[in-house]
Amino acid sequence: MIAAERKMMRLLLVVDESPASKSAIQHVGKFLGRRRGFQIHLLYLLPPLPPELLEFGGAEDPRREEQLDAELRHSQEKWIASARVSAEPVLNEAEKSLRKAGISSRNIRSEFSYPTEPREAARTILEQAQAKKCRTVVIGRKAHSWFRKITSGDVAERVLQLATDISLWIVQ
Protein backbone atom coordinates (compact mmCIF):
# COMPACT_ATOMS: atom_id res chain seq x y z
CA MET A 1 0.00 0.00 0.00
CA ILE A 2 1.41 3.42 -0.89
CA ALA A 3 1.78 6.09 1.80
CA ALA A 4 -0.84 8.42 0.28
CA GLU A 5 -3.46 5.66 0.33
CA ARG A 6 -2.68 4.89 3.98
CA LYS A 7 -3.36 8.50 4.97
CA MET A 8 -6.76 8.53 3.28
CA MET A 9 -9.75 9.01 5.53
CA ARG A 10 -12.18 6.28 4.57
CA LEU A 11 -15.91 6.71 4.66
CA LEU A 12 -18.64 4.12 4.03
CA LEU A 13 -21.70 5.63 2.33
CA VAL A 14 -24.72 3.31 2.34
CA VAL A 15 -26.90 3.87 -0.74
CA ASP A 16 -30.24 2.73 -2.08
CA GLU A 17 -33.13 4.17 -4.11
CA SER A 18 -34.65 6.21 -1.27
CA PRO A 19 -34.83 10.01 -0.95
CA ALA A 20 -32.96 9.66 2.36
CA SER A 21 -30.08 7.98 0.55
CA LYS A 22 -30.01 10.73 -2.08
CA SER A 23 -29.81 13.29 0.75
CA ALA A 24 -26.91 11.38 2.30
CA ILE A 25 -25.07 11.38 -1.05
CA GLN A 26 -25.63 15.14 -1.45
CA HIS A 27 -24.49 15.70 2.15
CA VAL A 28 -21.22 13.85 1.54
CA GLY A 29 -20.69 15.71 -1.74
CA LYS A 30 -21.31 19.05 -0.06
CA PHE A 31 -18.89 18.41 2.81
CA LEU A 32 -16.15 16.50 1.01
CA GLY A 33 -16.35 17.80 -2.55
CA ARG A 34 -13.05 19.17 -3.87
CA ARG A 35 -11.24 18.03 -0.71
CA ARG A 36 -8.33 15.66 -0.81
CA GLY A 37 -7.53 12.78 1.46
CA PHE A 38 -10.88 10.99 1.40
CA GLN A 39 -11.84 7.63 0.00
CA ILE A 40 -15.55 6.88 -0.25
CA HIS A 41 -16.87 3.33 -0.30
CA LEU A 42 -20.42 3.16 -1.66
CA LEU A 43 -22.28 0.16 -0.25
CA TYR A 44 -25.53 -1.16 -1.65
CA LEU A 45 -27.27 -3.71 0.59
CA LEU A 46 -28.91 -6.34 -1.53
CA PRO A 47 -32.33 -7.27 -0.11
CA PRO A 48 -32.91 -10.70 1.42
CA LEU A 49 -33.41 -13.69 -0.83
CA PRO A 50 -37.07 -14.52 -1.39
CA PRO A 51 -38.31 -17.33 0.89
CA GLU A 52 -38.58 -19.81 -1.98
CA LEU A 53 -34.83 -19.45 -2.58
CA LEU A 54 -33.76 -20.07 1.00
CA GLU A 55 -34.15 -23.83 1.12
CA PHE A 56 -36.00 -26.74 -0.39
CA GLY A 57 -37.91 -29.57 1.27
CA GLY A 58 -35.17 -32.10 0.69
CA ALA A 59 -35.31 -35.52 -0.90
CA GLU A 60 -34.85 -39.05 0.33
CA ASP A 61 -32.59 -40.01 -2.57
CA PRO A 62 -29.10 -38.50 -1.98
CA ARG A 63 -28.54 -37.95 -5.72
CA ARG A 64 -31.85 -36.11 -6.01
CA GLU A 65 -30.95 -34.10 -2.89
CA GLU A 66 -27.65 -33.11 -4.50
CA GLN A 67 -29.41 -32.12 -7.72
CA LEU A 68 -32.00 -30.03 -5.86
CA ASP A 69 -29.27 -28.37 -3.84
CA ALA A 70 -27.35 -27.47 -7.02
CA GLU A 71 -30.53 -26.10 -8.62
CA LEU A 72 -31.20 -24.00 -5.52
CA ARG A 73 -27.66 -22.57 -5.52
CA HIS A 74 -27.99 -21.79 -9.23
CA SER A 75 -31.32 -20.01 -8.63
CA GLN A 76 -29.79 -18.04 -5.74
CA GLU A 77 -26.81 -16.98 -7.86
CA LYS A 78 -29.13 -15.95 -10.69
CA TRP A 79 -31.30 -13.90 -8.30
CA ILE A 80 -28.23 -12.20 -6.79
CA ALA A 81 -26.87 -11.36 -10.26
CA SER A 82 -30.23 -9.85 -11.20
CA ALA A 83 -30.37 -7.84 -7.96
CA ARG A 84 -26.86 -6.51 -8.62
CA VAL A 85 -27.84 -5.45 -12.15
CA SER A 86 -30.89 -3.65 -10.71
CA ALA A 87 -28.67 -1.86 -8.19
CA GLU A 88 -26.05 -0.68 -10.70
CA PRO A 89 -27.97 2.48 -11.73
CA VAL A 90 -28.21 3.53 -8.07
CA LEU A 91 -24.47 3.13 -7.55
CA ASN A 92 -23.70 4.82 -10.87
CA GLU A 93 -25.93 7.79 -10.00
CA ALA A 94 -24.32 8.09 -6.55
CA GLU A 95 -20.85 8.07 -8.06
CA LYS A 96 -21.90 10.62 -10.70
CA SER A 97 -23.29 12.92 -8.01
CA LEU A 98 -20.10 12.67 -5.95
CA ARG A 99 -17.91 13.33 -9.00
CA LYS A 100 -20.07 16.35 -9.84
CA ALA A 101 -19.40 17.62 -6.30
CA GLY A 102 -15.68 17.45 -7.02
CA ILE A 103 -14.69 14.04 -5.66
CA SER A 104 -12.29 12.18 -7.93
CA SER A 105 -13.57 8.90 -9.35
CA ARG A 106 -10.35 7.22 -8.20
CA ASN A 107 -11.45 7.96 -4.62
CA ILE A 108 -14.84 6.27 -5.00
CA ARG A 109 -15.41 2.51 -4.74
CA SER A 110 -18.75 0.78 -5.34
CA GLU A 111 -19.62 -2.46 -3.57
CA PHE A 112 -22.53 -4.74 -2.79
CA SER A 113 -23.37 -6.78 0.24
CA TYR A 114 -24.67 -10.27 -0.28
CA PRO A 115 -28.39 -10.55 0.36
CA THR A 116 -28.85 -9.40 3.89
CA GLU A 117 -31.17 -10.82 6.47
CA PRO A 118 -33.13 -7.82 7.75
CA ARG A 119 -32.07 -8.31 11.35
CA GLU A 120 -28.44 -8.40 10.18
CA ALA A 121 -28.43 -5.32 7.90
CA ALA A 122 -26.91 -3.02 10.52
CA ARG A 123 -24.26 -5.60 11.43
CA THR A 124 -23.45 -6.03 7.73
CA ILE A 125 -22.91 -2.27 7.40
CA LEU A 126 -20.62 -2.15 10.43
CA GLU A 127 -18.70 -5.25 9.30
CA GLN A 128 -18.20 -3.70 5.85
CA ALA A 129 -16.98 -0.47 7.46
CA GLN A 130 -14.49 -2.42 9.54
CA ALA A 131 -13.34 -4.53 6.57
CA LYS A 132 -12.76 -1.39 4.47
CA LYS A 133 -11.11 0.42 7.41
CA CYS A 134 -13.77 3.14 7.30
CA ARG A 135 -13.91 5.24 10.46
CA THR A 136 -17.14 6.96 9.38
CA VAL A 137 -20.45 5.53 8.18
CA VAL A 138 -22.99 7.73 6.39
CA ILE A 139 -26.55 6.49 6.05
CA GLY A 140 -29.86 8.10 5.23
CA ARG A 141 -32.53 7.82 7.87
CA LYS A 142 -35.60 5.96 6.64
CA ALA A 143 -33.66 4.35 3.82
CA HIS A 144 -33.86 0.68 2.84
CA SER A 145 -37.58 0.27 2.45
CA TRP A 146 -37.29 -3.54 2.35
CA PHE A 147 -35.84 -3.45 5.88
CA ARG A 148 -38.64 -1.25 7.19
CA LYS A 149 -41.34 -3.45 5.63
CA ILE A 150 -40.01 -6.60 7.24
CA THR A 151 -38.95 -5.31 10.66
CA SER A 152 -40.98 -2.12 11.17
CA GLY A 153 -37.67 -0.50 12.04
CA ASP A 154 -34.97 1.65 10.53
CA VAL A 155 -31.48 0.46 9.57
CA ALA A 156 -29.92 3.76 10.69
CA GLU A 157 -31.42 3.41 14.17
CA ARG A 158 -30.08 -0.14 14.45
CA VAL A 159 -26.61 0.94 13.26
CA LEU A 160 -26.68 3.65 15.94
CA GLN A 161 -27.52 1.04 18.60
CA LEU A 162 -24.74 -1.35 17.56
CA ALA A 163 -21.94 1.03 16.58
CA THR A 164 -18.90 1.43 18.79
CA ASP A 165 -15.72 3.37 18.12
CA ILE A 166 -16.95 4.76 14.79
CA SER A 167 -18.40 8.07 13.58
CA LEU A 168 -21.94 8.01 12.22
CA TRP A 169 -23.57 10.57 9.97
CA ILE A 170 -27.27 9.88 9.91
CA VAL A 171 -28.82 12.14 7.30
CA GLN A 172 -32.52 13.01 7.50
What residues fall within each predicted segment?
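Redox- and metal-dependent alpha/beta enzyme cores, enriched for Fe-S-associated oxidoreductases
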Residues: 55, 75-99
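A structural signal for isolated positions on well-ordered beta-strands in alpha/beta enzyme cores
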Residues: 10-12, 39-41, 109, 136, ...
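Short, flexible loop segments at boundaries between secondary-structure elements
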Residues: 157-172
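Structural beta-alpha unit
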Residues: 6, 85, 93-136
